[in-house]
């Protein structure tokens, strides 16, 4: 079974190399953004969400908590027009591509959810013209 998956993956790389490169790039971007969110979370304990920033063409990690003058706060980005409508934490959790736990015992992504979010991100990134 594992050999069959390997051959299917190899066939996809040979037949569609541009898509494979873009898929690899998407995976690397996601892993870096997840590592950044986990690092920020370990530093201050806040919950972070990984979202797509269309202006910068990259994944960024933001927190929902209010910070004065910090660019990675949802409230700060909302005030500057990055979001069209107000979002609750649960809505942001559904829209993001990864989320961490918090110091107040809010749970982060489980292994299954992480896998789903990665696949969701890859599909989203393949549709982007970057």
Show where each model-derived region lies.
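Eukaryotic phosphotyrosine signaling hubs
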Residues: 6-12, 84, 120-128
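Basic, mixed-charge low-complexity alpha-helical segments
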Residues: 4-32
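Acidic, low-complexity, intrinsically disordered interaction modules
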Residues: 54-113
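Short glycine-rich, low-complexity/disordered patches
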Residues: 42-56, 130
């Amino acid at each position: 079974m594992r050999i069959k998956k390997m051959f299917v993956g190899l066939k996809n790389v040979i037949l569609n190399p541009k898509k494979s490169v873009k898929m690899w790039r998407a995976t690397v971007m996601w892993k870096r953004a997840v590592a950044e969110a986990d690092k920020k979370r370990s530093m201050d304990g806040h919950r972070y969400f990984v979202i797509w920033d269309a202006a910068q063409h990259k994944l960024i990690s933001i927190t929902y908590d209010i910070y004065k003058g910090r660019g990675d706060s949802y409230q700060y980005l909302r005030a500057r027009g990055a979001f069209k409508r107000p979002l609750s934490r649960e809505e942001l959790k559904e829209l993001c591509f990864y989320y961490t736990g918090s110091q107040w015992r809010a749970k982060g992504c489980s292994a299954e959810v992480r896998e789903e979010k990665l696949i969701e991100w890859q599909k989203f990134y393949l549709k982007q013209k970057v």
